[in-house]
Amino acid sequence: MTKITYSQAINKALTEEMNRNKKLVCFGLGVNDSLNFFGTTKGLEKKFGSERVFETPTSENAMTGIGVGMSLSNNPCVMMHQRLDFFLLAMDQLVNSAAKWHYMFGGKKSVPITIRLVVGKGWGQGPTHSQSLQSWFAHIPGLKVVMPTFPSDAYNLLKKSIRDPNPVIFIEHRWLHNIEQEIKKIKYTNKKNSTELISKGKDFTAVSYSLSTIEMLSIKNVLQQNKISFDLIDLKSIKPLNISVIKNSLKKTKKLLVLDSISHPFCSVGSEVLSQLYREKNIKLIKPPILKTLPDVPTPTSTFYTKDFYIKKNDILNDISKLVGKKIKFKYSDTLLHDVPDSNFKGPF
């Protein structure tokens, strides 16, 4: 069976949407360099020309202003940043213009811009090159925030984002760009609720998104060997956030683990999930829920500190053991460098 990577799925979605809408423009730093923005923009300039697919100067605020202006002029845009951190220079354009335009003009004007931001960890990039601020963007009225996990999600959510009349923050964890999926699963669906139950079990409910979902799947075999099964729910959309699938699962398991391994604890996506569930009347847990996040400190650079900063499989399994009240037998080495991806990763950094 032919497979497609996450990067290829994004490329496929961009190609199809640029064919569908002749006004759609893609631009950003690295769009036309030899690495083609992690392979996601490969061949686009050749197909659609340099007026629709182009590099920009290193001026994030100017890039965003141009994108907002073009979008207001009925030219939808996909703007790309190889680091979320760099986009912080453009917050005024995003928060005070793009996010508010539809509201301020009574729904008569919109800003159809999709902003692709890459997050992740790796190779000691430290405090200013590895931030994941999805909760920050989700706090802003007028913005949607999505974080797809699998190629089919990236394909679907990017197409939906591009077709949305208002701004969408599309966040990709770069460790996901080489994940593969059967190409037959790459189909466009217009479902409103992106939250999905991707694995079924009975002992507890796990909620995750983006790389956190892959981390939960990586310990599934160990749990099965210990006769523990779980419902795994992948959020995909951070805002809007739909908790109906989680509620249905908790009626069965009554135990909850929220793995938010790319957020800090305060006002995290995980804490928002718990907050919304707490306000529901009919949810009764038999044990306090567990929320796993990064510590409330900036990302360290030294591997001496990263080994205690990033969440490890052992950490997750120990918490699951407490949650289900059962000792779990497992063997994972903690001697690896915790901010270096495995051999499947093929990205530039």
Please place each PLM-identified region on the residue numbering:
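Thiamine diphosphate
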Residues: 1-167, 171, 334-349, ...
